[in-house]
Amino acid sequence: MSASSTEATNLAGKTCLITGGAGGLGRALAAAFLRAGANVAICDLNEERLKQASAELSGTGAGSLLAANADVADPAAAQQLFDRITAKFRTVDVLVNNAAIMDRFDPVADLDHELWDRVISVNLAGPFIFSKLALRVMLQQPKPDGCILNIASGAAKGGWLAGRCDLGLARICRG
């Protein structure tokens, strides 16, 4: 969102959840949503970066901020986060699936199985878990409404594992 588009967008009363929200694009999106008046929840696995982002984002815009340490690949942690968000803000109107990790770009014959499992869990299962929970909340609203944004990288064009997850995420969203 550019500064001019956020000035024209009023998201007062809306709640946005951004996974991987403590750094880079996630933090920038959180700031933009806050400036547009939305309440914003960010989650990240990196506790130190989460504290820094929380300090930087607090007081940005008219919305409130909730920062939580959570592993997007853990369904129980995801449910606890949604419970906290709905207890504080009542709903989730926008979900941004931004959390992702990269592999080491190893050829398939050399891929470490534990790394494979972790990349699939964070980059593909995580957005599925969060989208499922967000849809349940969105559909319970008096007027069902909401938006889910899935962030993917250009790695989908390469032969890397993270790129394959981006392709899988794009296909999940079509169903």
UniProtKB/Swiss-Prot annotation:
Transmembrane segments: none annotated. InterPro entries: NAD(P)-bd_dom_sf, SDR_fam. Its EC number is 1.1.1.-. Diterpenoid pyrones display various biological activities and FDDP C shows anti-cancer and anti-HIV activities. FDDP C also shows inhibitory activity of 42-mer-amyloid beta aggregation that is involved in the pathogenesis of Alzheimer's disease. Keywords: NADP, Oxidoreductase. The keyword Transcription does not apply. One of its GO terms (molecular function) is quinone binding. It is an enzyme of class 1 (oxidoreductase). PANTHER family: 3-KETOACYL-ACYL CARRIER PROTEIN REDUCTASE-RELATED (PTHR42760:SF127), SHORT-CHAIN DEHYDROGENASES/REDUCTASES FAMILY MEMBER (PTHR42760). Belongs to the short-chain dehydrogenases/reductases (SDR) family. This is Short chain dehydrogenase/reductase dpmpG. It comes from Macrophomina phaseolina (strain MS6). The gene is dpmpG.
